[in-house]
């Protein structure tokens, strides 16, 4: 059995955050490991505007997938929230969008800023019928302006 493991290890403010995505061949096809959850944090609020951009300078893109067979999931609701250029959270830096017919998404923002000892990050919450809600965070590598970040969901039982 072949395993392909992709590690992204951004190191910021002395803390290491590891995100991994592995796919393995199986008789039934591919299996994707679920995206690791991360804390919701105290700044989440529902009802963010429907939009794919809250700034310029950083692009986060990827595919929403099922962990069961690694296939793309369409119409997944993806919520983003992050700090603005001043390091503060606010409604101007919240967005809701949906994965497209290929399961992909593309989100434009400013480069997130650190605050209260936390490294720069983008909060993400993904919901879609038939799957467990995913709450995670993306930690940009210092000095980058874009990243690929697949969101792999676990089916409800």
Model-derived features: positions:
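Bacterial N-terminal signal peptides
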Residues: 9-19
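Bacterial N-terminal signal peptides that target proteins for export
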Residues: 1-11
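Beta-strand-dominated extracellular/periplasmic modules and repeats
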Residues: 25-157
């Amino acid at each position: 059995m072949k395993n392909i493991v992709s590690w992204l290890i951004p190191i910021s403010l002395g803390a290491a955050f590891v995100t991994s995505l592995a796919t393995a061949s199986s008789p039934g096809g591919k299996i994707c490991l679920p995206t690791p959850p991360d804390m919701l944090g105290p700044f989440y609020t529902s009802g963010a505007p429907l939009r794919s951009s809250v700034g310029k300078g950083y692009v986060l893109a990827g595919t929403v997938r099922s962990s069961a067979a690694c296939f793309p999931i369409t119409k997944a609701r993806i919520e983003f929230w992050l700090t603005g250029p001043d390091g503060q959270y606010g409604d101007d830096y919240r967005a809701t969008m949906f994965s497209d017919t290929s399961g992909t998404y593309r989100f434009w923002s400013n480069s997130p800023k650190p605050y209260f000892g936390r490294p720069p990050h983008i909060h993400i919450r993904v919901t879609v019928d038939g799957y467990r809600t995913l709450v995670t965070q993306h930690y940009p590598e210092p000095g980058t302006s874009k990243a690929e970040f697949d969101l792999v969901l676990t089916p409800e039982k």
